[in-house]
Each structure stands twice: as structure tokens, then as C-alpha cells.
Amino acid sequence: MGKLEVIAHPLIQHKLSILRRTDTSTKAFRELVDEIAMLMGYEVLRDLPLEDVEIETPITKTVQKQIAGKKLAIVPILRAGIGMVDGLLSLVPAAKVGHIGMYRDEETLKPVEYLVKLPEDIDQRQIFVVDPMLATGGSAILAVDSLKKRGASHITFVCLVSAPEGVKALQEAHPDVDIFTAALDDHLNDHGYIVPGLGDAGDRLFGTK
């Protein structure tokens, strides 16, 4: 079973509390999502592969370590996942970025996939799927399904807020996928929203309804 890690760093929890507030503006919400994603990256990227590289200091030549950035991919689930990309890219700017587009059918609460655009060598990359919310788990499961159909095998899911129902569903569907979240909330309501949650992350990121 993949691990579930709730990142309880004080800075992340402080910013997440502001993010949840109803009166947080679109501008502030967007900035906070970016900042939290970057802060989460410290733990999410802890086990990145390293490679030897020869460099020259002012004193001598030496072999040191660097991240094998060409073997990473960040894949946001559109549209809300876009808000988390830059925060992680600021830490690993050489990573490639793919996109998986989905929307939720408001009657069935099931995700519908409308776009998959990935690096050609996605099967050779360590992949970080990002989406602010892990609610029912439907979108996350479908995204991982799409990646595995294309040969991907090393996949991590990163979100800001999660529900126990979504975590359970993703773990059961894909037990090899690690989950990183900033908060594990109480439950889902009848409309499939996380409680207490933070509302619709996509609408709050882009100022839509």
C-alpha cells in the first residue's frame, strides 16, 4: 500500500487556514496555493533520484550531486491543478509538465476526461500528479489510470486538502501510489464537497462560479 503523508509544517497549516476562509480574495487564494505547493515540495521531493556531476569550484574540480531533473514530470489535473504547478517547478525547473483535463458531472459526480497531453517519454519519468482537492477520488483515479495506460509506473499524488473517502478510493484503486496532502478533512457532504474543505478550488483560483 502506498503511503499517506499529511504534511503538518506550521507554515503550511497557517497558509492553509487563510486559504480556507470565505473572505480570501481570488488573488490571495492563487498566491497561497502556489506558496503551499512550493512548501509541500520539500517533503514531496525528498526521495528524488540524484546523479553525479563534475563541476569546477574556484579551488578545484570535483564530483557532486544534482537532481536528475530530466526524469521528472508534473501533471496537473485541469483546471485547478494548474495553480500548484509553478510552486513545484520553482524547486525543479527542469521537470516537464503534462496536462490531464477533467470536469465533474454535477449529476453523477463522476469525472469526465477531455484532454490528455503528456511528455512523449512519460513512461520513463517519476510523475507528480497535482490537484488541490482529493474529494471522491474519481478524478485522481482516472488520471492515474490514464498515466498507467501510457506506461507510467512511478506516480505520486499531491493535494492540499483531502477527504477520507477519496484517500480510501485512490488507495484501493492504485495501492502503489503515494499520497501527500496538507490536510485530511472530516468527510464529504451530499454534493461531494470536502467538509470543512475550502469550496471549489477551480472557481476560487480563477474567479469563476
Swiss-Prot record:
Molecular-function annotations in GO: GTP binding; magnesium ion binding; uracil phosphoribosyltransferase activity
Biological pathway: Pyrimidine metabolism; UMP biosynthesis via salvage pathway; UMP from uracil: step 1/1
Enzyme Commission identifier(s): 2.4.2.9
Glycoprotein listed as a keyword: no
Enzyme superclass (EC): transferase
GO biological process: UMP salvage; uracil salvage
Chain sites annotated for binding uracil: 194, 199-201
Binding site for 5-phospho-alpha-D-ribose 1-diphosphate: 79, 104, 131-139, 200
Activity regulation comment: Allosterically activated by GTP.
Cofactor: Mg(2+)
The record's free-text note on cofactor binding: Binds 1 Mg(2+) ion per subunit. The magnesium is bound as Mg-PRPP.
UniProt keyword terms in alphabetical order: Allosteric enzyme, Glycosyltransferase, GTP-binding, Magnesium, Nucleotide-binding, Transferase
One protein family per Pfam: UPRTase
Record-linked SUPFAM superfamilies: PRTase-like
Similarity field: Belongs to the UPRTase family.
HAMAP family, per database record: Upp_B
Name listed for the protein in its UniProt record: Uracil phosphoribosyltransferase
Species of the source: Streptococcus sanguinis (strain SK36)
